[in-house]
């Protein structure tokens, strides 16, 4: 019985642990999304984009919106 409990504990610890590589990958994705937003002249906004702007993507997985001013969008075309 003691062996079974020990084995169960080890399995729980192994499957619940997030590796540092996963954290690093998430950080790189966040950085890439933020850089892409700024590259196109956008800015990050916490809620829906204001009326004079357009939604062009996400800044982070935390549901921040990447918005761009309509004047900048018209000037680039």
From Swiss-Prot:
One of its GO terms (biological process) is defense response to bacterium. One of its GO terms (cellular component) is extracellular region. InterPro entries: Defensin_beta-like. Belongs to the beta-defensin family. Has antibacterial activity. It comes from the Eukaryota. This is Beta-defensin 11. Disulfide bonds join 37-66, 44-59, 49-67. It is found in: Secreted. Expressed in both adult and neonate brain, and very weakly in kidneys, epididymis, and testis. The keyword DNA-binding does not apply. The keyword Membrane does not apply. The gene is Defb11. Residues 1-23 form the signal peptide. It comes from Mus musculus. Keywords: Antibiotic, Antimicrobial, Defensin, Disulfide bond, Secreted, Signal.
